[in-house]
């Protein structure tokens, strides 16, 4: 069914490519900001939230490995079961990519932030997908993270993506959007995708994004198409070396200092 749909889309005159979204399992682990909405805590994998235990999946896994993952004490710790689940999603992505490429068109996708996170949360091992362009959804606010989350994700994505895939960074528009774009472009992203289009509808927002894009193009033109900041892109593992984290700590201290002591 999916293959025939993609073939039909690829035959549309003037279409340059196909971008897939939601090629994944239902969230095994939700972003932290959504836990209160559903009244749950997902500090680890819980079987009741993993919808990968479909009878057909179980039978296919048993045929390959000779045992039922459900019979284990904690199936979430079974590397074979995790990789098997990821491979089912990868198979669909690459089937679509094969069709798209057979028509000479570009293949793109919008997965979760990094292959490692995406594999754990929704079984998207997207570093193995045959993509021309990837737009990982690096919405730091969804994970109650600061701007450093974007930098770290980009460094990880550059390392783990398919070498043939061009990396963009998907960002949700917020007050700190310019800092977010800086973090993405300075740590490996070759471009930015913005969610949602409604954030681009005011003259002021369009002017801001245009000015930012023009400035990035100018910097790259002066440096043979390369962003000079990339040469110093390293993931910060010491929290006391991260200005974003230190600023949040200072803000929290100030907040607590204003709380009256009972």
Go through the PLM ranges and name each one:
Residues 6-7, 90-97, 151-159, 181-182, ...:
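Generic structural signal for well-ordered alpha-helices
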Residues 138-147, 168-231:
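Substrate-binding cleft of secreted/luminal carbohydrate-active enzymes
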Residues 18-20, 107-109, 134-136, 167-171, ...:
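Hydrophobic faces of well-ordered beta-strands that scaffold small-molecule active sites
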């Amino acid at each position: 069914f999916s293959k025939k749909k993609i073939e039909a889309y690829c035959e549309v005159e003037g279409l340059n490519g196909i971008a897939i979204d939601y090629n994944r399992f239902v969230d095994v682990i939700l972003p932290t900001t959504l836990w209160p909405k559903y009244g749950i805590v997902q500090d680890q994998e819980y079987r009741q939230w993993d919808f990968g235990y479909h009878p057909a999946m179980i039978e296919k896994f048993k045929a390959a490995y000779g045992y039922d993952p459900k019979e284990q004490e904690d199936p979430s710790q079974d590397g074979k079961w995790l990789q098997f689940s990821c491979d089912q999603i990868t198979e669909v992505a690459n089937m679509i990519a094969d069709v798209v490429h057979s028509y000479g068109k570009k293949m793109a996708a919008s997965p979760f932030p990094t292959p490692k996170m995406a594999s754990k949360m929704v079984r998207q091992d997207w570093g193995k997908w045959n993509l021309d362009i990837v737009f990982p959804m690096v919405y730091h606010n969804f994970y109650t993270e600061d701007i450093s989350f974007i930098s770290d994700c980009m460094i990880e994505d550059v390392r783990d993506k398919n070498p043939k895939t061009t990396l963009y960074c998907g960002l949700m528009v917020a007050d700190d959007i310019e800092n977010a774009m800086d973090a993405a472009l300075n740590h490996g992203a070759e471009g930015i995708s913005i969610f949602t289009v409604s954030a681009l509808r005011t003259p002021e927002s369009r002017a801001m994004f245009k000015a930012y894009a023009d400035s990035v193009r100018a910097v790259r033109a002066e440096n043979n198409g390369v962003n000079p900041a990339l040469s110093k892109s390293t993931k910060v593992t010491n929290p006391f070396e991260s200005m974003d984290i230190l600023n949040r700590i200072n803000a929290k201290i100030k907040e607590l200092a204003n709380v009256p002591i009972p």
